[in-house]
Swiss-Prot record:
May function as an early signal that helps mediate the activation of T-cells. This is Early lymphoid activation gene protein. The gene is DIAPH2-AS1. One of its GO terms (biological process) is signal transduction. It comes from Homo sapiens (Human). Expressed in heart, kidney, lung, and skeletal muscle, with lower levels in pancreas and liver.
Length: 149
C-alpha cells in the first residue's frame, strides 16, 4: 500500500505503527511531541533516517533533519497525552565494544493494540481514509469514490 500522507493526518496517526502507511518516500514512523510532528523517512544506512518535521500546524515551517537513533514503537494505555520518551541503552557493537544508544519509545492512546496486531494494513487503510474524509482533503481515493456515487 503506497498512500500520500497529508501532514494534517499526522496528529491522528501519531504513535501508530505506520509501516504500511506511506508517502512517496515511504514514511516509516510518525510521532508527536510538544506540538512537533515527525515522520521518519528511512535511509539506506543502518540507524540513519530523515525526519520530516512540522512545528505546529504551519506547513511553511517544515524542514528535514537527519540524526542517528534506534526507534522502538510501544503501545500503552495511559492518562498522559501522546509523548515520546528518550532513554539511553547500552549495547555491544560488532567489535564487542559497549556503546550507548538513544532509544525513543512511543506512547499512544489513539490506537487499540489488538487492531494493529491482527490486521495492520487493513486497519491503517480504513483509519487513513476515515481521517482523510473527516478533514475533507483533496486527492484521496475516498473522495473519488464519493464523486462516483
Amino acid at each position: 500500500m503506497n498512500l500520500y500522507l497529508h501532514p494534517k493526518l499526522w496528529p491522528q496517526l501519531a504513535g501508530t505503527k505506520t509501516l504500511h502507511v506511506a508517502d512517496a518516500q515511504r514514511v516509516r514512523k510518525i510521532t508527536v511531541h510538544d506540538g512537533i510532528w515527525d515522520a521518519e523517512l528511512p535511509r539506506a544506512k543502518r540507524n540513519h533516517s530523515y525526519h520530516l518535521r512540522y512545528h505546529g500546524s504551519s506547513y511553511s515551517r517544515c524542514f528535514l533533519e537527519r540524526y542517528r537513533c534506534k526507534t522502538i514503537g510501544v503501545f500503552r494505555r495511559s492518562n498522559q497525552p501522546d509523548c515520546l520518551e528518550t532513554r539511553s541503552e547500552k549495547a555491544k557493537n560488532r567489535d564487542g565494544v559497549v556503546q550507548e544508544k538513544s532509544v525513543r519509545t512511543l506512547f499512544s492512546e489513539c490506537v487499540n493494540q489488538c487492531d494493529i496486531r491482527r490486521r495492520p494494513t487493513r486497519f491503517l487503510r480504513m483509519f487513513y481514509h476515515q481521517k482523510h474524509f473527516q478533514l475533507g482533503l483533496k486527492g484521496t481515493e475516498t473522495e473519488k469514490n464519493e464523486r462516483r456515487l
